[in-house]
A protein has these predicted regions:
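The feature captures the beta-strand-to-loop junction immediately N-terminal to the Walker
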Residues: 35-37
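ABC ATPase NBD coupling module
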Residues: 66-81, 86, 110-114, 130, ...
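Conserved ABC ATPase "signature" region
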Residues: 100, 111-129, 176-180
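Conserved ABC ATPase signature
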Residues: 133-137, 141
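Conserved catalytic motifs of ABC-family nucleotide-binding domains
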Residues: 154
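Catalytic Walker B motif of ABC-type/P-loop ATPase nucleotide-binding domains
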Residues: 158-162
Length: 241
């Protein structure tokens, strides 16, 4: 079983400490949320985990090996995929060309590339959109294409930054199903998103960050019933359903 883990991550900006010793872990086939109010430190923690920001202290480990100093492209090769909130697809290319752009960096022969391309397009039902220009895709279709592109290199983990932002309710449901599919494939998923209800509905467990520390962790049901979590984040009237 693969494991992605952080140990005692800290980060300060201009003398202000925004993350104070955060430790978390994600295992293969597990969907984990990283949640909290604005300014809590969750985004900085997420960025340190993926490699966008360097910690002042602490470590990030993949299967027990320290990857803290590895740049993002090295982490990706080792199995840590990342999907940013912003559009990351090449807008001037078709869906098929977006996937081929990654496949062509992998040293595969032409026949193997074409076979793998067909498999990837079919996996998340992108075959009908194979020749569509990326800039013509809806928000949900674009998310689907970006997740498929992340699957090209067979990641152990995928870190999703605001996957439910800017898409309509039907597309949210589709993306949730795709995330469940990643879980079924044995891929570990770490999600940070302001859409707390949509996130908690699909997570196995979640961490709640407040004031730069993890104040609570647990299953969605346990967190939504926790008085402190309601006080600092969810609100007294919050319900999952």
């Amino acid at each position: 079983m693969a494991t992605l883990r952080t140990h005692n991550l800290t980060k300060s900006y201009g003398g202000r400490t925004v993350v104070r010793g955060v430790s978390l872990d994600v295992a293969s086939g597990e969907i984990v949320g990283l949640l909290g109010p604005n300014g809590a430190g969750k985004t900085t923690t997420f960025y340190m985990t993926v490699g966008l920001t360097s910690p002042d202290s602490g470590t990030v480990e993949l299967d027990g090996l320290d990857v803290t100093d590895d740049p993002m492209y090295v982490r990706a090769r080792k199995g840590i995929g990342y999907l940013p909130q912003e559009a990351s697809i090449f807008r001037g290319l078709t869906v098929e060309q977006n996937l081929l752009a990654i496949l062509e960096t992998m040293g595969l022969d032409a026949a193997t590339r074409r076979t793998r391309l067909r498999e990837l397009l079919a996996e998340l039902n992108l075959t009908p959109l194979a020749h569509a220009q990326a800039h013509t895709l809806s928000g949900g279709e674009r998310r689907r294409a970006e997740i498929t592109r992340a699957l090209v290199v067979s990641p152990k983990f995928i870190l999703l930054d605001e996957p439910f932002a800017g898409i309509d309710p039907i597309a949210v449901s589709d993306i949730q199903k795709i995330i469940f599919h990643l879980k079924e494939r044995g891929i570990g998923v770490l999600i940070t998103d302001h859409n707390v209800r949509e996130t908690l509905r699909i997570t196995d467990r979640a961490y709640i960050v407040h004031g730069g520390v993890i104040v609570k962790s647990g299953t969605p049901d346990s967190l939504t019933e926790d008085e402190e979590v309601r006080r600092i984040y969810l609100g007294a009237e919050f319900r999952l359903d």
